[in-house]
């Protein structure tokens, strides 16, 4: 279903853009438009269906999935395809533009006006989602409303839901919906794909934050330099008014140097930037199963608190979230006060180092992290709290950077006492070949390694052999709402399968 925006007459929208109406009479000009979408399955009667060139197919090729709409917006190529292939339009007005991206932005801004809401964004390879949710949680604790654009909690029916950053129309619609709900802020994840493909439109961020950069999306960017340049674009050309940069990695240091000295920088390493007037010092310590942190501001103000999420990375991401909020003008004393009153930050992020345990069952952790760096972080965190054995379940996505699969096998084999290799989003790849590539990375004897194609069966097998002092780490899938196999998105919940496995464990069956 398309999120509804501000109703406009089609004729008024046309006048405000460079689109032209073709092959239809003026009777259509009185139609009202209240939504815009690029997702054919979600188009409704009063929507404009946007049909531009995609990565592999043109949007007009999906017209047969559109039941009814107010108009179709396409480019000259789309119009040519419609004419040559005699695609049905059901007497629907066809809008053709010579400037697809710029006209789409104008239309989206008219139907989904997003003035008067303050937007901040987070980019990087790992930590975007958790940092965004932590920032939103801190705002909520202070009584401040924040809308979010997220991959957490989406359903399989939302075709763009598992995009880190939604398509342009959906992003504007979500921000508008948050604004209508009287949100003060909106937080978004800015993926390299979204930045490259213009999915952020002409949105100017009040704060842009950079977490880190490690190898990922090499099927898209081909090399790390191209990947870095895509991320860097968010901090250039007035795309953001201020910045927060983690300089604990070489790419963070480089970004800071190349984008000017006005950014706030955060680091665990005191040798970086101590002379910088906007330097924030972070440090982390273990507190039981969770982590405490200390954050020292440029003025010397000290925040000491903790976060209930498992893993050092979440404590560091909390520090970054605090710096982001301070850059938005929120007093650090106010943030410190709510953390003290609450006894730390207590929250659950579905599929992000999420712990499941009942009675004397083994601890099961579900984590979305699928990059080499994120998987190693999860393995280290899980190993550190495990008295018994660490049993790991790993998968790798099809049609995504295959070079990391061997590294995943190497890491999981090194940290795990027992390893199950299973299938995830194989897409159009042979899942057995993906498993083999992971297995190739496992060093040493493989008697503790088992391939089980079914993720559900892998979960059950892992829980069945686990003892109460063992930990089962399900790495690489998280809370994804479906399995992407051979072009079909099959509804699936790993978290539900874990719950069922623990119920079976409790029953002794």
From Swiss-Prot:
UDP-N-acetyl-alpha-D-muramoyl-L-alanyl-D-glutamate binds at residues 164-165, 191, 199. The modification N6-carboxylysine is found at residue 231. Its main location: cytoplasm. ATP binds at residues 124-130. The keyword Ligase applies. Pathway: Cell wall biogenesis; peptidoglycan biosynthesis. GO terms for molecular function: acid-amino acid ligase activity; ATP binding; magnesium ion binding. GO terms for cellular component: cytoplasm. InterPro entries: Mur-like_cat_sf, Mur_ligase_C, Mur_ligase_C_dom_sf, Mur_ligase_cen, MurE/MurF_N, UDP-N-AcMur-Glu-dNH2Pim_ligase. It is an enzyme of class 6 (ligase). Carboxylation is probably crucial for Mg(2+) binding and, consequently, for the gamma-phosphate positioning of ATP. Keywords: ATP-binding, Cell cycle, Cell division, Cell shape, Cell wall biogenesis/degradation, Cytoplasm, Ligase, Nucleotide-binding, Peptidoglycan synthesis. Its EC number is 6.3.2.-. The keyword Transport does not apply. It is found in: Cytoplasm. GO terms for biological process: cell division; cell wall organization; peptidoglycan biosynthetic process; regulation of cell shape. Belongs to the MurCDEF family. MurE subfamily. Catalyzes the addition of an amino acid to the nucleotide precursor UDP-N-acetylmuramoyl-L-alanyl-D-glutamate (UMAG) in the biosynthesis of bacterial cell-wall peptidoglycan. This is UDP-N-acetylmuramyl-tripeptide synthetase. It comes from Tropheryma whipplei (strain Twist). The lineage of its organism: Bacteria, Bacillati, Actinomycetota, Actinomycetes, Micrococcales. The gene is murE.
């Amino acid at each position: 279903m398309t999120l509804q925006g501000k109703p406009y007459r089609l004729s008024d929208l046309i006048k405000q853009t460079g689109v032209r109406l073709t092959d239809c009479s003026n009777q259509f000009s009185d139609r009202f438009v209240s939504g815009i979408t690029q997702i054919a399955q979600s188009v409704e009667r009063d929507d404009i269906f946007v049909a531009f060139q995609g990565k592999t197919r043109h949007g007009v090729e999906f017209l047969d999935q559109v039941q009814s709409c107010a108009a179709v917006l396409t480019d000259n190529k789309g119009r040519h395809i419609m004419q040559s292939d005699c695609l049905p339009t059901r007497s629907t007005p066809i809008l053709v533009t010579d400037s697809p991206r710029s006209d789409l932005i104008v239309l989206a801004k008219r139907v989904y006006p997003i003035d008067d809401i303050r937007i901040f964004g987070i980019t990087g390879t790992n930590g975007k989602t958790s940092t965004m949710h932590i920032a939103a949680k801190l705002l909520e604790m202070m009584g401040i409303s924040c809308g979010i654009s997220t991959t957490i909690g989406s359903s399989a029916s939302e075709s763009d839901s598992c995009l880190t950053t939604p398509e342009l129309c959906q992003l504007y619609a979500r921000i508008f919906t948050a604004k209508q709900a009287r949100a003060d802020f909106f937080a978004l994840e800015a993926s390299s794909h979204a930045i490259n493909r213009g999915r952020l439109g002409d949105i100017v961020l009040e704060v842009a934050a950079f977490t880190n950069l490690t190898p990922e999306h090499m099927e898209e960017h081909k090399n790390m330099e191209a990947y870095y340049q895509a991320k860097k674009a968010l901090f250039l050309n007035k795309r953001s008014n201020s910045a927060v940069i983690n300089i604990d990695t070489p790419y963070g240091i480089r970004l800071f140097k190349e984008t000017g000295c006005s950014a706030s920088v955060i680091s665990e390493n005191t040798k970086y930037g101590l002379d910088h007037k906007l330097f924030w010092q972070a440090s982390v310590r273990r507190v039981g199963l969770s982590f405490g942190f200390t954050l020292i501001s440029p003025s010397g103000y000290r925040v000491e608190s903790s976060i209930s999420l498992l893993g050092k990375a979440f404590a560091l991401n909390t520090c970054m979230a605090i710096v982001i909020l301070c850059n938005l003008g929120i007093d650090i004393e106010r943030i410190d006060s709510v953390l003290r009153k609450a006894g730390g930050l207590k929250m659950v992020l579905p599929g992000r180092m999420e712990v499941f345990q009942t009675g004397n069952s083994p601890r099961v952790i579900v984590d979305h992290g699928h990059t080499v760096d994120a998987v190693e972080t999860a393995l280290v965190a899980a190993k550190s709290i495990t008295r018994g054995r660490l049993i790991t379940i790993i998968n790798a996505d099809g049609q995504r950077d295959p070079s990391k699969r061997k590294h995943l096998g190497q890491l999981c084999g090194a940290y795990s006492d027992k390893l199950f290799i299973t299938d995830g989003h194989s897409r159009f790849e042979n899942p057995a070949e993906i498993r083999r590539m992971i297995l190739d990375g496992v060093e040493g004897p493989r008697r503790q390694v088992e391939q089980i194609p079914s993720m559900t069966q892998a979960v059950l097998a892992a829980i069945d052999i686990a003892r109460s002092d063992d930990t089962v780490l399900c790495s690489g899938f998280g809370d994804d709402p479906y399995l992407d196999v051979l072009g079909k998105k099959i509804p699936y919940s790993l978290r539900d399968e874990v719950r069922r496995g623990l119920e079976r464990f409790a029953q002794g069956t």
